[in-house]
């Protein structure tokens, strides 16, 4: 499994905005739980699904007004 951490700008204090909530919903539509946080969010995904899920996250974020998306993907061996 891979861990994906992401932030989406612009930051809107007190309300994450559609550019964030729609992107989170796009990930959740794949049956993936998102740990939503004020300074970044994360989820776990398998390697096969990674490009599809990331693609949907980016597409929906920018369709809804994102100006910048930062994504970090990590593999943690147990």
Descriptions of predicted regions:
Residues 1-78:
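Charge-rich, low-complexity N-terminal segments
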């Amino acid at each position: 499994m891979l861990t994906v951490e992401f932030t989406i700008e612009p930051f809107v204090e007190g309300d994450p905005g559609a550019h964030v909530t729609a992107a989170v919903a796009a990930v959740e539509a794949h049956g993936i739980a998102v740990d939503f946080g004020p300074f970044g969010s994360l989820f776990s995904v398998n390697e096969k699904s990674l490009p599809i899920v990331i693609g949907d996250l980016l597409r929906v974020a920018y369709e809804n007004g994102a100006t910048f998306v930062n994504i970090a993907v990590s593999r943690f061996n147990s």
